[in-house]
């Protein structure tokens, strides 16, 4: 019997998940112990799997049909279904890169503004049209 979590999303007990993916309960248990699948636990300690776990299990089954090693499957799973912690790290790194770029752009614009008007015009004339448009956009954004 398919259940629902507190958000209303479908959940599956181990036997239901196994049947939907065409594997045994023991296989689901094995993949869970390896960390390839992550169940939620009920207050009575039953394991429940969500729709994402079903997609992951079907992906694992497809990879096994291609005779991929579980270590390779784990790598592919991380790329196919990134964890929220990994995405948080990537977003944090991206935010740092954006801050660094903003500082660089601000420094360049500050030096540009200190140039004589004729030197500014000369510099602008050397830029291709698409780069000039980007430069002017940055000037507007940061002014």
UniProtKB/Swiss-Prot annotation:
The UniProt record lists the keyword Zinc: no
Entry keywords, A to Z: Activator, DNA-binding, Transcription, Transcription regulation
Listed GO biological process terms: regulation of DNA-templated transcription
Signal peptide boundaries: none
Disulfide bonds: none
DNA-binding region boundaries: 14-33
GO molecular function: DNA binding; DNA-binding transcription factor activity
Keyword DNA-binding applies: yes
PROSITE patterns cross-referenced by the UniProt entry: HTH_MERR_2
Domain HTH merR-type residue range list: 11-79
Annotated function: Transcriptional activator of the copZA operon.
Note in the entry: Binds a DNA inverted repeat of copZA operon.
Name of protein: HTH-type transcriptional regulator CueR
Source lineage: Bacteria, Bacillati, Bacillota, Bacilli, Bacillales
This protein's encoding gene: cueR
